[in-house]
Amino acid sequence: MSKINAVRLINVNYNNNAYRISDETLHFNGKSTLISLQNGGGKSVLVQMLTAPFVHPRYRNTKDRLFESYFTTNKPSFILVEWALDQGAGYVLTGLMVRKSQDMEEDRKENLDIIGIVSEYQSPCIQDIHHLPVVEKGKKEMILKNFNSCRQLFETYKKDRDMKFFYYDLTNYAQSRQYFNKLMEYQINYKEWET
């Protein structure tokens, strides 16, 4: 069974935007991991974010926090999880790009714009968890690319036959289904995460 190798969170705000994770990578290296934080340190937030890419929308909420409450602007947030594949077969990056919906239609079901991504690779590359170019690091600050720029980047990667890169608009039922089917190819079964 594949194991979680690393997790990267970019532009995740919580506790009514009082706390912000700008760009953090947690290295699990496929091992069991204990995360010890003080009360209010973000343990529940971390668990909610880690499960979000692997569950359907209604399972992304907890009894205390709606998933959509973390995303209050048009700037994208990223929840990225890298898996080490069995028998040294490489890695697969799974994750979400999320922002508050910019569509003002009243009958819209989703309050978020969500893109699911899946990228398979053998070794470090431009579309891996560490190098995916969704942020630019300046001398003093990190500059986050906008949602549409990232989507165009993903489209370029998807068209490149040398890359095994896929992205899905998870607000579209058919594409959401394709995304979860793609995860199943790597034995990432949403049913195991939703129980």
Which ranges hold each PLM region?
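Extreme N-terminal "head/tail" segments of very large remodeling/mechanoenzyme assemblies
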Residues: 1-140
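Electropositive, glycine-dotted interaction segments
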Residues: 95-195
